[in-house]
Regions:
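Extracytoplasmic
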Residues: 26-29, 56-58, 97-99, 113, ...
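A recognition module on extended beta-rich or small alphabeta surfaces enriched in W/G with H and D/E
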Residues: 141-148
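Mature, soluble, non-transmembrane domains
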Residues: 11, 97, 121-122
Length: 148
């Protein structure tokens, strides 16, 4: 019985790659991947303030934008992304403002965030942003406190 419970727990939650794979194939979906090399080039053009210093910590980015997709695709995405937790990620912030939901999730090891996930749904918006890098939780907390 314990083994069955363990297997069920592992299977619970949506795998992030399968979400990207499923929805990037939808008509009018935009999926953009920015490689570490391109991120390095982009970093040459950002300023030197505290936000820019934080942005330098991220090595790659992947964006899934479903704004131009059909209502049924957006609803299906919203249900999948909001109904269950995403494997390996913890929710840092969740905001529901006039029908628009924003969640910021993180995958971390010790006190370092390795991946940051931003999910926006509602009011016609369906966007998923994945940032990979190494950022301390305290730096993200400061940024979130400033923005909220």
């Amino acid at each position: 019985a314990l083994a069955l419970l363990f297997v069920c727990h592992i299977g619970f939650g949506q795998d992030l790659n399968s979400l990207f794979d499923e929805f990037k194939k939808e008509p009018n979906a935009d999926c953009i991947s920015i490689s570490p090399f391109m991120m390095t080039i982009g970093k040459m053009f950002i300023g030197n303030d505290s936000d820019a210093k934080l942005a330098r910590k991220f090595k790659s980015m992947r964006i899934l934008d479903l704004e131009a997709c059909s209502t049924s695709v957006k609803e299906r995405f919203s249900k999948k992304i909001n109904a269950q937790r995403i494997k390996g990620y913890e929710t840092l912030v969740q905001v529901n403002d006039e029908g628009e939901k924003v969640r910021i999730l993180a995958k971390s090891k010790n006190d370092v965030i390795r991946e940051l996930l931003i999910v926006c749904t509602g009011n016609g918006d369906c966007t998923l942003v994945q940032l990979k890098g190494k950022v301390s939780k305290s730096k993200i907390a400061k940024l979130l406190a400033k923005e909220m």
